[in-house]
UniProtKB/Swiss-Prot annotation:
<comment type="pathway">
    <text>tRNA modification; tRNA-queuosine biosynthesis.</text>
</comment>
<dbReference type="GO" id="GO:0033739">
    <property type="term" value="F:preQ1 synthase activity"/>
</dbReference>
<dbReference type="GO" id="GO:0006400">
    <property type="term" value="P:tRNA modification"/>
</dbReference>
<keyword id="KW-0963">Cytoplasm</keyword>
<comment type="function">
    <text>Catalyzes the NADPH-dependent reduction of 7-cyano-7-deazaguanine (preQ0) to 7-aminomethyl-7-deazaguanine (preQ1).</text>
</comment>
<feature type="binding site">
    <location>
        <begin position="62"/>
        <end position="64"/>
    </location>
    <ligand>
        <name>substrate</name>
    </ligand>
</feature>
<dbReference type="InterPro" id="IPR043133">
    <property type="entry name" value="GTP-CH-I_C/QueF"/>
</dbReference>
<dbReference type="InterPro" id="IPR029500">
    <property type="entry name" value="QueF"/>
</dbReference>
<dbReference type="GO" id="GO:0005737">
    <property type="term" value="C:cytoplasm"/>
</dbReference>
<keyword id="KW-0521">NADP</keyword>
<comment type="similarity">
    <text>Belongs to the GTP cyclohydrolase I family. QueF type 1 subfamily.</text>
</comment>
<protein>
    <recommendedName>
        <fullName>NADPH-dependent 7-cyano-7-deazaguanine reductase</fullName>
        <ecNumber>1.7.1.13</ecNumber>
    </recommendedName>
</protein>
<dbReference type="Pfam" id="PF14489">
    <property type="entry name" value="QueF"/>
</dbReference>
<dbReference type="InterPro" id="IPR050084">
    <property type="entry name" value="NADPH_dep_7-cyano-7-deazaG_red"/>
</dbReference>
<feature type="binding site">
    <location>
        <begin position="81"/>
        <end position="82"/>
    </location>
    <ligand>
        <name>substrate</name>
    </ligand>
</feature>
<feature type="active site" description="Proton donor">
    <location>
        <position position="47"/>
    </location>
</feature>
<dbReference type="InterPro" id="IPR016856">
    <property type="entry name" value="QueF_type1"/>
</dbReference>
């Protein structure tokens, strides 16, 4: 097993590395993860997406290698577009407890269908 595969396989979301946020100002962190992959729970075919994460930290920020490894744990999981983005959103919201957070999954078209899933803490239903 290669070292990257080992790191992904052994990654434990419960022990995801987060750091204290020592900044006195409010600010937004924007992270783009252009190589997201999961497997369709129906067909098993791979689905690819770019994940856009934006959040206003309170007491914690995510360590960048930790978010990379966490995102890569979805690579061989059978999970829908909706479930994957909701899981990422809920995990980061629970771990970081940010003042505000938004997670967007912009999935590559498959079968002539393009899907964008968005979860955000300030969601207002029209």
């Amino acid at each position: 097993m290669r070292y990257g595969e080992k790191e992904i396989k052994e990654f434990d979301v419960e022990n995801m590395e987060i750091w204290p946020n020592d900044a006195k100002n409010d600010y937004i962190i924007k992270i783009t993860l252009p190589e997201f992959m999961c497997c369709c729970p129906r067909s098993g075919y791979p689905d690819f997406a770019t994940i856009y994460l934006e959040y206003m930290p309170d007491k914690f920020v995510i360590e960048l290698k930790a978010i990379k490894l966490y995102i890569n744990t979805f690579m061989y999981r059978n999970v829908s577009h909706e479930a994957s983005i909701n899981e990422i959103y809920n995990t980061l919201k629970d771990k970081l407890k940010p003042k505000w957070i938004k997670v967007v999954g912009d999935f590559n078209p498959r079968g002539n269908v393009h899907t964008v899933i968005e979860c955000r803490s300030d969601m207002v239903v029209p």
